[in-house]
Amino acid sequence: MASNGENSLKILQVSDCHVSSDPNASYRGQNADLNLQKLLPAMHAFSPDLVLLTGDVSEDASPASYDRVADMLETVGVPVLALPGNHDDPAVMQCRFPRGPWHGPCASTAGRWLLVLMDSTEPGRVSGSFTQQALEQFDGQLRDSSANFVLVALHHQPVPVNSPWIDRYALENPGSFFKHIDRDSRVRCITWGHVHHDFWKQRNDVVLLGAPSTVANSLPRTGRFTLDPAGPACRWLELGVDGAVDTGLLGPVQSPAGKTSQRIR
């Protein structure tokens, strides 16, 4: 993936769209198509270099749902990298989103950054895990890369997000995952979907990020899903040439400059 190594890399993270074959279908009382459409003006205004889809793109894994999401994101006019969530069918999803971890971790170089997408899903399960083979492939991709910094994306949270309703469905082998992460000091950011609310934490020199949903979000730190009246959102990231990570959220009526951001060096 081409990018000017002297400029920051602007990424728009879109997650947990839960679109169904029926465009009028409701998800937790919200219209998934309509709420994603509401975010498009803010997405265009952010002017990203690429879009990163972090799973649960579809609610029913239907071809029609992936078609509509792909059509909407095509209006942003940049490449789309995508990984599946527990609601997705990878075989169906990759027909519209070919750039993803469909045959093992997917690595793309953009400027000084290596972006690695990993599939944490297990067929028929809500929780996730990584096979040893996938983790070894991840090691190999980092060894083969001359990038200065690394971002890793997955669907399931590798750390608790303090929301019991979703923490029971987390990544089941986080210890193995972080063992491989800790082998390479170039890893600066790990980001995921699944949790349906904003999350930020720092672990050593790595920023850990949970993304909100484009359809319905929960108030954080709740025992059960509790609809957040703030509405749908997506995450923006700016990955600096110095390894810094700036990030914040975009909502339907908010501009990137108007959002609170975090930075790690």
Predicted region positions:
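Acidic/histidine-rich helix-loop elements
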Residues: 12-34, 59, 90-102, 123-132, ...
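N-terminal active-site segment of His-dependent metallophosphoesterases
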Residues: 1-68, 161
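Active-site-proximal beta-strand elements of phosphoester/diester hydrolases
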Residues: 8-22, 112-122, 151-153, 206-212, ...
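Short, electropositive alpha-helical surface patch
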Residues: 64-79, 169-178, 205-214, 263-265
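Active-site neighborhood of phospho(di)ester-bond hydrolases with catalytic His/Asp-centered motifs
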Residues: 13-15, 50-56, 80-86, 119, ...
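Metal-dependent catalytic neighborhoods of phosphoester/phosphodiester hydrolases
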Residues: 23-24, 53-74, 89-102, 128, ...
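Binuclear metal-dependent phosphoesterase catalytic core
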Residues: 180, 202-265
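His/acidic metal-ligating clusters that form di-metal
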Residues: 39-50, 127-207, 243-245, 261-264
